């Protein structure tokens, strides 16, 4: 029925903008393409096969809490999913709550204020040394809304060799696709981080984690003057 096309197009936009945003293919049979509209109906179509999980499983969230309690060197990796979910505040709250510095993927830049003490900058092949070094030394990675692309990980067989990985993502197909994870949590970044902060509200970071974040902040201070150095202006040479 050609008359259903208006509803299909509207529904495709709803799907494209929900869950993990992305393109939607509309496959239109030839007889529909050649048909004529008798009416205009823009009501949404029921799509029972598409139902993104927004709220993370509370049992998985509690397991994440337990892994965090055991960690001495936690870090947070933030991707574009944090920005799309408007979860920057929840991300920052978790970072300070558990003494875990934050680094971002290229698409995750802006998930945390780059001038924040907890921000280590971007990781990966175009990232900062302090960020990449901390990946290798950490014992727990909390990855939020990130795909673990090769631009961020480099060689997979040498990525985060000492870390357990918690992966939070609204798209279950992304979890475990590139990097093996110890704890998957499917859900909207804002909702899951809010739940995690809630179960950790009485958490007191251990001394090892406090020393860890202090060490990384000091490393960042040592590296940054090299890119902000302005004591002696550069002079062009012939």
Task: List each model region and its residues.
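Structural signature of the thiamine diphosphate
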Residues: 1-43, 67, 132-164, 199, ...
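Cofactor-pocket helix-loop regions in the catalytic cores of large enzyme subunits
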Residues: 3-4, 27-117, 210-238
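Hydrophobic/aromatic beta-strand patches that form the interior of the parallel beta-sheet core
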Residues: 24-26, 103, 142, 166-168, ...
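Short gly/pro/ser/thr-enriched loop/turn and capping motifs at secondary-structure boundaries
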Residues: 33, 108-113, 149-150, 172-176, ...
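Short beta-strand elements at the ligand-binding edges of bilobed clamshell
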Residues: 51-55, 115-127, 178-191
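Conserved acidic residues
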Residues: 72, 139, 182
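Glycine-rich, anion-gripping cofactor-binding loops and their flanking helix/strand elements
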Residues: 80-166
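Phosphate/pyrophosphate-binding active-site segments
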Residues: 162-238
């Amino acid at each position: 029925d050609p008359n259903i096309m208006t509803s299909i197009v509207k529904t495709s936009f709803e799907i494209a903008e929900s869950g993990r945003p992305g393109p939607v293919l509309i496959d239109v049979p030839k007889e529909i393409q050649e048909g004529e509209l008798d009416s205009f109906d823009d009501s949404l179509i029921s799509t029972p096969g598409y139902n993104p999980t927004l709220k993370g499983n509370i049992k998985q969230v509690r397991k994440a809490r337990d892994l965090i309690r055991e960690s001495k060197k936690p870090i947070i990796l933030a991707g574009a999913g944090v920005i799309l979910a408007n979860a920057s505040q929840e991300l920052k709250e978790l970072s300070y709550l558990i003494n875990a510095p934050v680094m971002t993927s290229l698409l995750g830049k802006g998930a945390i204020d780059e001038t924040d003490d907890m921000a280590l900058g971007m990781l990966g092949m175009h990232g900062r040394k302090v960020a990449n070094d901390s990946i290798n030394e950490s014992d727990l990675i909390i990855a939020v809304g990130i795909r673990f692309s090769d631009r961020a990980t480099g060689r997979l067989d040498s990525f985060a060799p000492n870390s357990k990985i918690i992966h939070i993502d609204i798209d279950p197909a992304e979890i475990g696709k590139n990097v093996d994870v110890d704890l998957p949590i499917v859900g909207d970044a804002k909702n899951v981080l809010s739940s995690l902060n809630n179960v950790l509200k009485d958490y007191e970071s251990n001394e090892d984690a406090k020393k860890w974040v202090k060490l990384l902040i000091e490393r960042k201070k040592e590296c940054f003057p090299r890119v902000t150095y302005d004591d002696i202006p550069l002079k062009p040479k012939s």
